Regions:
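Ordered core of a single globular domain
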Residues: 129-295, 301
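Active-site loops and adjacent core secondary-structure elements that bind or stabilize anionic groups
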Residues: 10-11
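A general structural signal for short secondary-structure junctions and capping/turn motifs
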Residues: 17-22, 268-272
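Structural signal for hydrophobic packing residues in well-ordered secondary-structure cores
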Residues: 61, 83-116, 144-155, 190-209
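Single conserved hydrophobic/aromatic residue that forms the stacking wall/gate
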Residues: 1-7, 294, 299-301
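Non-transmembrane, amphipathic alpha-helical segments
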Residues: 82-96, 124-135, 182
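Active-site-adjacent bridging/hinge elements
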Residues: 71-77, 109-124
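N-terminal leader/propeptide and maturation segments of large enzyme subunits in energy/redox metabolism
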Residues: 20-104, 168-177
Length: 301
């Protein structure tokens, strides 16, 4: 992407990518790599794990609609959230979500092939095509920070719905490590979350025996996901956008860009072969002086 035209650049960690994809690979969807002419991807969007965590706390009842959406597991009834209890309930709720997620995607891909098989595009790919089954995670850093807050600080339910009794808001007392600061206490939770979700996806049958993958990526959908997600134990307010991709939660990174990227690099790429996205905004002057007279625009013939 040309920085002088649109003001943004996409940097790819080629050294890591080549190990899996070889020299001749392409970015087929946002941050998803593929061996050119040899593979195709069944697109998978994202699962809102932030909302899944709230479902785990509230026994499958949606905080925004007050409707029973997930399975009616026993909710957390104590006012102080206990880490082991919340993680156990969250793990069980992720099982339900992964099963629903993969089943819906299988249906979509089957019906798409049935009614709109992309023959023209497939003609450009090898006969024995390798198929990957993409999935994704939204709300990644908010889940990590919420679990970290429950583990290392004191999180209490500060408001309950008078009709359903579900938790509506949380109060956090004390400090806690946050993802994006090169702190292993938070980053270890991030690694656990990624592996746990991928393992659950891999247990399900995927359409045409495609290889299950996952990503930590949102482009603008984090805004919509956030609109329908309630208050989080990490302090994020209901209705506000989720942090994009594998970015730290808004305002959580306190140790600078390198610390944020160090947290990112602890996430094993082989567990997120559909891609890991980290979006940074910075003042151009932070990169050093730029001589605009030396910028050249591309020529399109």
């Amino acid at each position: 992407i040309c920085a002088c035209l649109v003001g943004s650049e996409m940097c790819i960690r080629d050294r890591v990518m080549k190990v899996t994809w070889g020299d001749d690979y392409s970015i087929c969807c946002c941050v998803s790599a593929t061996q050119t002419g040899k593979e195709m991807q069944f697109f998978g969007a994202r699962a809102n794990l932030a909302k899944c965590l709230l479902y785990a706390i509230n026994g499958g009842v949606d905080m925004k609609s007050k409707v029973q959406v997930g399975p009616a597991y026993k909710p957390v009834t104590s006012d102080v959230l206990e880490y082991d209890e919340v993680v156990a309930k969250f793990d069980k709720m992720m099982d339900w979500l992964a099963d629903l997620y993969v089943n819906v995607l299988n249906l979509i891909h089957y019906m798409h092939d049935k009614y709109y098989y992309e023959a023209a595009e497939m003609a450009l790919i090898d006969t024995d095509v390798k198929r990957t089954f993409a999935t994704g995670i939204a709300g990644f850093s908010h889940v990590v920070d919420s679990l970290s807050a429950i583990k290392y600080a004191k999180v209490t339910v500060s408001e309950r719905d008078p009709e359903t009794g579900i938790a509506m808001a949380f109060k956090t007392e004390g400090d806690f490590p946050k993802y994006g600061n090169d702190d292993d206490r938070a980053d270890d939770i991030a690694v656990w979350l990624l592996k746990s979700f991928l393992d659950k996806i891999k247990k399900r049958h995927t359409y045409r025996n495609s290889e299950p993958t996952t990503s930590i990526l949102t482009i603008t959908s984090n805004v919509v996901y956030g609109k329908f997600t309630g208050n989080m134990p990490d302090g994020r307010k209901a209705g506000t956008p989720l942090a994009p991709g594998a970015n730290p939660s808004y305002g959580a990174e306190q140790n600078g860009l390198l610390a944020s990227l160090n947290s990112l690099t602890k996430l094993p790429y082989e567990w997120a072969l559909d891609g890991i996205s980290n979006t940074q905004t910075m003042n151009p002057d932070a990169l050093g002086p730029v001589s605009y007279t030396h910028l050249t625009l591309p020529t399109i013939a």
